[in-house]
């Protein structure tokens, strides 16, 4: 397991079977000390992905279904990729990417990418919500649905923002701002947003193809007919079972296979997730 070469700047969790999270669309009245309702989930892992929980000094191997929150960090090694679900949005990292969750609450999902490539696919945005990606040179803010890509130059000197669909705003030093619209790809060479290039969207690479295949999985999931897209993990239901109508309960999901002697809380592990405490993380 490889540790990042340079430094990189927590929602009551209910996990049952596939670690589904129900996210309310409207904010629930909370006291100032209550944790946020929104949490991220590691929904796909491939290769060697390192994880540093908030407040820890050590890096460990990332686990599927792990809940993520403010202060958590990820690093993808060579030939590795990772996917995270945050409500009706999905974040994906390509190989050799350094990622940090700066702030995750009911309205804001502020992240940081200091190395590598990231795709942000937003299916829906509730009023007052935003998604932000900070890089070494700028901040990219999304407040509407769309498909976005962020590339950091190998030396960290520039950031390229690509908007496949939607619109996003870039912010830099001295209150500088720039709107990147659908069909545009802009490379920013400085933090003041004075030195930039407007480019045609590059030909899609292997990472883009993978992102498209994952997006299609979500968009064509049968479970979308029965479960809100805001339920984290809804697409996984298609992989492990199907839906039937019952006179008493209506639409009911049934697992396709149940091992003999199955019981809850056997296939997985308990993890301490601050500030919510011990949380069951399923292996499915």
Where are these regions (language model features)?
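A short, compositionally biased domain-edge/stem linker segment
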Residues: 25-32, 230
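Low-complexity segments
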Residues: 126-128, 173-177, 181-284
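Bacterial N-terminal signal peptides
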Residues: 13-23
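Flexible, surface-exposed loop/linker segments and immediately adjacent secondary-structure boundaries
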Residues: 29-169, 174-185, 220
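Bacterial N-terminal signal peptides that target proteins for export
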Residues: 2-14
